[in-house]
A protein has these predicted regions:
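Conserved catalytic-core segment of nucleotide-activated headgroup transferases in glycan assembly
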Residues: 10-27, 36, 152-159, 163-191
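Short beta-strand/turn micro-motifs composed of small residues
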Residues: 8-10, 91, 128-130, 148, ...
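An aromatic- and histidine-rich active-site surface loop
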Residues: 63-82, 182-184
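N-terminal pre-catalytic "stem/leader" segment of glycosyltransferase-like enzymes
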Residues: 1-67, 181
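Nucleotide-sugar donor phosphate/pyrophosphate-binding loop at the beta->alpha transition
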Residues: 43-47, 86, 97-118, 153, ...
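Donor nucleotide-sugar binding/catalytic pocket of nucleotide-sugar-dependent glycosyltransferases
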Residues: 121-158
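Active-site proximal beta-strand in glycosyltransferases
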Residues: 58-59, 80-97
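Membrane-proximal helix-turn-helix segments that form the acceptor-binding/catalytic region
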Residues: 75-82, 106-126
Length: 191
């Protein structure tokens, strides 16, 4: 029996790309399913080659697949449809930005909100992080599943080596786009 092949397109190796795509799909282990994880920045990735794409049953991606032109995207979508390949779009964050967001101006200029909403409509299924996002996504595509963020606790970075102490330690990890969220914690630390 031939293995069921899944092409997982990863946009980066940090943050979202790592925790939503690379880590979970690297741990995926099923005897009848082969997961092929590729970096989108790999210039040898032939997403325009129907012969290459035809070996896969599912394509998974987060954020977007950066096509050079709308025609490339259209050709890709037509090939995927001809080959009956299912598209799973992983969406980890709300795509409607407030004007306080550092990328708001660029987001508006590039109609990024509209692009994300179109990707939601086009996908066969969407995975997301929370019930809140699932409800927002369902307005465009009802085939949405919550897959919470997770970490591989067997990785060295998560192996605890803590020493007992009376001190309270707090660790926060995130990018500049989460600064507004971090400010919500300020009153608790002022007590």
């Amino acid at each position: 029996m031939n293995k069921f092949k899944v092409l997982v397109l990863n946009s980066d190796m940090d943050g979202v790309g790592y925790h939503r795509i690379l880590s979970p799909y690297s741990c995926f282990n099923h005897p009848d399913i082969e997961v092929d994880i590729r970096l989108l920045m790999d210039s040898t990735l032939p997403l325009h080659d129907e012969g290459f794409l035809s070996q896969y049953k599912i394509i998974v991606f987060n954020k977007s697949i950066p096509f050079r032109t709308p025609e490339y995207k259209q050709n890709f979508m037509e090939m995927v449809k001809r080959q009956n390949i299912k598209i799973i779009f992983d969406l980890d964050d709300y795509w409607v930005l407030s004007n306080a967001h550092p990328n708001y101006k660029m987001w508006k200029e590039q109609n990024a909100q509209g692009v994300v909403e179109q990707q939601i409509r086009e996908a066969d299924a969407i995975t997301t992080t929370t019930k809140f996002l699932a409800e927002k996504i369902a307005e465009f595509n009802p085939n949405v599943t919550v897959v919470p963020n997770s970490v591989n606790l067997k990785e060295q970075q998560w192996i605890s080596d803590k020493k007992r102490t009376e001190k309270v330690r707090f660790l926060w990890g995130g990018g500049i786009t989460h600064l507004v969220d971090l400010r919500l914690l300020k009153p608790a630390f002022e007590k």
